[in-house]
A protein has these predicted regions:
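Primarily extracytoplasmic/secreted proteins
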Residues: 1-243
Length: 243
């Protein structure tokens, strides 16, 4: 089983307040890729994703942070989606990931951590889908924070790949701005992961999460097991007794 890989990424700096956030998708998206969008708006209020997207979470106070995924059909590369929100500035990051079928085993996120500090710290995630256990997961760490901190932040240890950050700028009051940052961990086969903390330049209200994208199942997984009797092959479903 091979680790999933990042095909491409995109960021959107939403520097103008709007109730309809136009979010960039990655330039390269292949059919079957897992698309994930991470979105933070500088005001609370539920985010609305287009049809076909499945939300991991949608959490507010004082800002709103959400994430959603979709199995790509291959037409999405270089396009945008519109996310509805309470009118505000925003920041978004999008990933296209190959090597998993999200329709079989959807990606997973942690419950999420929150606080007010200069160290947004994602919580632990032990994926349960596909039976759980140690696998070649692709791990991502996310932080969303209110304010005008230096962007990008310092990322958690080992999260050195595919680092992406977006922000809403510095115009207007500090509370009208936000930041979001995401990074991929170096490959790690494990049953769970608890990233270290991000480091930002100024303390403020934040939320942080850990994500896991499952590896594709091995060839033949779930297929009938072939047995031989007297040299003649025949199929027998794996769960059947006697075998």
């Amino acid at each position: 089983v091979a680790f999933p890989t990042v095909t491409s990424t995109a960021t959107t700096n939403g520097t103008t307040a709007t109730a309809s956030a136009v979010v960039n998708l990655p330039a390269t998206v292949n059919a079957g890729d897992t698309l994930i969008v991470f979105h933070r708006s500088a005001s609370s209020g539920v985010h609305g994703y287009p049809g076909g997207w499945t939300e991991f979470f949608d959490l507010g106070t004082p800002d709103e942070t959400s994430a959603a995924w979709k199995k790509a059909d291959g037409s999405e590369g270089g396009t945008t989606i519109t996310i509805t929100q309470t009118s505000s500035k925003f920041a978004s990051v999008a990933y296209a990931i190959a090597g998993e079928d999200p329709a079989v085993t959807p990606p997973e996120s942690s419950v999420g951590a929150s606080g007010n500090s200069a160290g947004p710290d994602p919580d632990n995630l032990a994926p349960a889908g596909g039976g759980g256990g140690a696998k070649d997961y692709l791990w991502l760490a996310l932080m969303g924070i209110e304010g005008e901190q230096t962007s990008p932040p310092t990322y958690p240890a080992n999260y050195t790949e595919n680092q992406n950050a977006a922000d809403s700028g510095t115009a207007g009051a500090i509370t009208t701005n936000c930041r979001v940052a995401v990074a991929k961990r170096t490959d790690l086969n494990a049953a769970s992961e608890n990233p270290g903390a991000f480091t930002v330049s100024v303390a403020d209200d934040w939320r942080a999460f850990t994500f896991a994208v499952h590896p594709a199942p091995p060839p033949g997984a779930g297929q009938p097991t072939v047995k031989r009797w007297g040299g003649v092959p025949f199929a027998r479903p794996t769960p059947a007794g006697l075998w």
